[in-house]
Amino acid sequence: MQKKIFLLEDDYLLSESVKEFLEHLGYEVFCAFNGKEAYERLSVERFNLLLLDVQVPEMNSLELFKRIKNDFLISTPVIFITALQDNATLKNAFNLGASDYLKKPFDLDELEARIKRFFNDDPIEIMPNIFYHQNCLSVRGKKEILPPKTAQLLEYFLEHKGQIISSQALENNLWEQAIDDSTLRTYIKVLRKLLGKNCIETHKGVGYRFNPL
């Protein structure tokens, strides 16, 4: 089935270039040029991936993403595109549940690689002899079906491997509400038991980093 990608970009030439490139790769691409237009389209149609330029007219993409999550319970992966050299903006994006980001100017081959991470149907090798595929963890040949929240947590860590992720970002992405710290620690403990205690680092007062050896 053809994957559908939604692109929000107010630079018409860049939008057309990205659209043409992605269509050549076999994706179905829909474009919007401002936040209001994007909101209206996303209110009636679902996509497999969102590419959102942060600074667009009428409603910036951070506000757009927050609204579509709250109004339509959309959990589609989103890659933010930004020309801003502003770590606070990126932090806000990840706190909202962003899956990834690209900084302008970006290479189209890099964009392709980022997108394929979300559409790859092959098992992901987490570390030697440990694979993950569609809620199933294979550890040295032994298969373990992960509960939905545990699987979502692992997938979020895989998307942000090597990055420090705040507890708030994990809460927003997986529960979309405040939870007890003990709840998150329980899920972390389950993954550590399956993958090894050193695969998830705790950065006290900051968050966690998934760093499998």
From Swiss-Prot:
InterPro entries: CheY-like_superfamily, OmpR/PhoB-type_DNA-bd, Sig_transdc_resp-reg_C-effctor, Sig_transdc_resp-reg_receiver, WalR-like, WH-like_DNA-bd_sf. Pfam families: Response_reg (PF00072), Trans_reg_C (PF00486). Keywords: DNA-binding, Phosphoprotein, Transcription, Transcription regulation, Two-component regulatory system. GO terms for cellular component: cytosol; protein-DNA complex. Residues 4-119 form the Response regulatory domain. One of its GO terms (biological process) is regulation of DNA-templated transcription. The modification 4-aspartylphosphate is found at D53. SMART domains: REC (SM00448), Trans_reg_C (SM00862). The keyword Iron-sulfur does not apply. Phosphorylated by CrdS. One of its GO terms (molecular function) is phosphorelay response regulator activity. CDD domains: trans_reg_C. Residues 121-212 bind DNA. Disulfide bonds: none annotated. Member of the two-component regulatory system CrdR/CrdS that induces the transcriptional induction of the copper resistance determinant CrdA. Upon phosphorylation by CrdS, functions as a transcriptional regulator by direct binding to promoter regions of target genes including the crdA promoter or nitric oxide-responsive gene promoters. This is Transcriptional regulatory protein CrdR. The lineage of its organism: Bacteria, Pseudomonadati, Campylobacterota, Epsilonproteobacteria, Campylobacterales. The gene is crdR.
